[in-house]
């Protein structure tokens, strides 16, 4: 389960992207990206990585049976460039099926182009419609407004806030813990049972459904 299947998609700005496996030989992309403090400042482990630490991570990742990873590849004609990765980790299929999502785009020239939002929608669609998950969890450090907006647009909502979770740029930062619930009727009924969903969850459900609908139209599963 180390890598998820290839998905091809086009962003709202017309950029071609592939979510696909990457090789050990591709890890320099992450070493170079994680050398920049602006890339790592809002990551839980904001440390510079070396090729040795990235290789150790890769070797563990490909053996992990509870995670699915995708490289984020920018495609321009016949050229493919690895610019980051996204993942579903801690995939659990007990009485409730859930996972934790994450993403990083290490090449800064691809920031602000809607790539993360498109990847969120593709990953969410795959998690709900192909893995049958009820819930996806994520977290955002305060100050990382772009990540918050991208996740919210995809159907994530705030569950609770961990105070003073990280120290970033000279100050303590809180961390918002988020969730995205599967909007399908069967999953929604199982999750809420006899409880009445609050208004914010109903609004998030509409956004999650819109994300899934977008992916159905714009994502090709290879």
Q: For each of these PLM feature ranges, what is it?
A:
Residues 59-71:
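A short helix-loop-beta-strand connector motif used in the catalytic cores of GNAT acetyltransferases and
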Residues 38-59:
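Conserved GNAT-fold acetyl-CoA-binding loop/helix
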Residues 33, 37, 61-64:
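Generic N-terminal helix/loop capping motif
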Residues 49-53, 61-63, 105, 195:
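Juxtamembrane/interface motifs at transmembrane-helix termini
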Residues 53-57, 71, 100:
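Generic beta-strand or strand-like secondary-structure segments
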Residues 1-36, 69, 77-222:
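Acyl-donor (CoA/ACP) binding surface of acyl/acetyltransferases
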